[in-house]
Design a protein with these regions (language model features):
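Secreted, disulfide-rich extracellular signaling modules
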Residues: 2-465
Length: 465
């Protein structure tokens, strides 16, 4: 068993990183009379709305959190809000600090809310103005719960709001009187009198010696500070960007209280930590958008649409039906590859959306409960650590007939065999992106109604005598 595993690991490691290949398929003698190939199986395509997706589980945190209002000219409006708990820093300021608040010897200078950008996950036009706000949560979160993208939390008092240009991010900031080099960050500042007058600080966190308890433990802090909601206001001047931030994965994100005494200047940071609940809430509105008539179950949807629409967040998934596998003459599937082609020149599309399609696609099926789970071929590829080599699904640029096209190719050999054998009773497979909760990108694929670049299933099989 161990030796077999070593051999398999070697074979997977030597598989091409661009195109998926099934081990053994390249040694099948296609000249044998019992080995046949076909690419003419009937396929039907459509686009479907996704159910909620998981955006928080304490054992498996996201590394990036989307935030914004995006009005996509094809997909319609998408909104993402961040809800997160803050936690204490671990070291409590000296008790003298709190004793001197009521006498005025310790004074709050400003409150700075910092979030580290994850610019690699931005989608849209980052040279833009965004009205971004931080609110205090009016209800508590629970780090023992699992939260989904359709969960949300009520916003209470406004903490801070500013109009920002995300392309002009800070990499230098002042912390405790020192200028510090940081990753790209967003800084929202509540200064001077505004900070001192805010009830969170004047009545709780910066009141007098009684405030000391809220710096001692997370339990005490969460009694008075449920957490924060970060969102882009619907009134924002432009709605063509989805930003992304790092919370617990950042060394700088948090809420900083800057203060001074007659002899010292310092700060205290409330942090986002892996112990705190943190999640994103998504909303999608396709009403009136070009994509609406293509969505399964919304209009008079018919299989064989010209386009398939796939989006990150809680956005649309593609659906492929393979209804007529019975014509394959009792086959043993050697290889089955589903090929999809990126659509070009879609009317009304915008360059900075079209030119940043999804880099990796996944295929799923519905289980008995109606939940999407990945197909067997993808599960095997993940288990052996060879996603693109064994399953594929990565975006590949190639030239066919002197035309540059972008394609995704995915192995579905095991899944197709299970369909033929009756193990899988549904003829549907669903197309989505990897790490959907952390991506706002989207792809438009030519559907089965396209005359040239329709999805194609290339199958090589042996007739089972």
């Amino acid at each position: 068993m161990f030796a077999t595993s070593i051999i398999l690991m070697f074979l997977f490691a030597t598989t091409s990183c661009n195109e998926p290949s099934l081990i053994g398929a390249d040694v099948i003698d296609t000249d044998r009379p019992d080995v046949l190939s076909t690419d003419t199986l009937t396929l039907f395509s459509s686009s479907v709305e996704d159910d909620s997706i998981r955006t928080y589980n304490g054992l498996n945190l996201l590394t990036t959190y989307l935030c914004g209002v995006l009005e996509d000219p094809i997909f319609g409006k998408s909104t993402s809000e961040i809800n997160a708990e803050l936690r204490v820093a671990g070291s409590v300021p000296d008790t003298t600090f709190f004793q001197n608040i009521s006498t005025g010897l310790t004074e709050l200078d400003s409150v700075v809310f910092i979030l580290e950008y994850d610019t690699t996950k931005f989608f849209g036009n980052n040279i833009t103005q965004q009205d971004i706000s931080v609110y205090l949560l009016d209800e508590s979160m629970d780090n023992r719960e699992t939260y989904y993208s359709d969960d949300n939390f009520l916003a209470g008092d406004l903490l801070v709001t500013e109009t920002i240009n995300p392309s002009q991010f800070d990499t230098l900031t002042i912390i405790g009187g020192d200028t510090v080099l940081t990753p790209p960050i967003m800084r929202l500042v509540l200064s001077g009198a505004d900070a001192q007058a805010h009830p969170l600080f004047s009545d709780i966190l910066f009141k007098d010696f009684s405030s000391y308890q809220y710096y001692e433990s997370d339990t005490s802090l969460l009694q008075v500070l449920n957490g924060v909601k970060v969102l882009v206001e619907n009134s924002t001047p432009t709605k063509d960007l989805m930003m992304a931030f790092k919370l617990s994965a950042s060394s700088v994100s948090g809420m900083f209280l800057h203060y001074h005494s007659p002899t010292d200047t310092s700060f205290y940071r409330f942090r986002f930590t892996s112990n705190g609940a943190q999640m994103t809430s998504f909303e999608h509105d396709h009403a009136g958008s070009p994509v609406e008539p293509f969505i399964d179950g919304i209009a008079d949807e018919t299989d064989g649409e010209e386009y398939i629409f796939i989006q990150g967040m809680q956005g649309l998934n593609g659906k492929i039906r393979i209804p007529y596998t019975s014509g394959l003459q009792n086959p043993i599937i050697n290889q089955a590859q589903l090929k999809l082609t990126i659509a070009t020149m879609v009317p009304g599309d915008v360059t900075f959306y079209r030119d940043n399609p999804l880099e990796q696609l996944f295929l799923s099926k519905k289980n008995a409960e109606g939940d999407l789970i990945i197909i067997a071929d993808l599960n095997t590829a993940i288990e052996v650590g060879s996603l693109t080599g064994f399953f594929g699904g990565n975006l590949v640029e190639k030239t066919e007939n002197n035309i540059v096209i972008n394609t995704y190719t995915m192995n579905i050999s095991e899944h197709l065999q299970d369909m033929i054998n009756g193990v899988e009773t549904s003829d549907e497979i669903f197309i989505s992106t990897a790490s959907k909760a952390q991506s706002a990108n989207r792809s438009i694929i030519f559907g089965t109604g396209h005359p040239t670049y329709a999805p194609k299933l290339n199958v090589t099989y042996t007739i089972n005598q």
